[in-house]
């Protein structure tokens, strides 16, 4: 009986990645989230990367709680440049909190978004 209760109490986690389409559950949320982090990221592009002309890409897992608060941010694949990895994590924290879950995400406790972040020439950040 305790195992059943523990299973029932575990958080409902939904994962979105680059392969998720606009028809997938939470696709609208992922798109709004992407726009926000790109806007914040371009406003807060890392000075060290700009000065030293460091470019690259990394994969990041961002986990968001139902209320929009940040649960976790984790580098899954490093860019090989600590300044970029740290900047991506900082940008996620600066952009928080995010919108609370509504609509098709209302029954989800935590949303995991996995994206590739690109720090590009022209000091531009994009993610997909």
Language-model segments: which ranges?
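Short loop/turn motifs at secondary-structure junctions and domain boundaries
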Residues: 50-55, 108
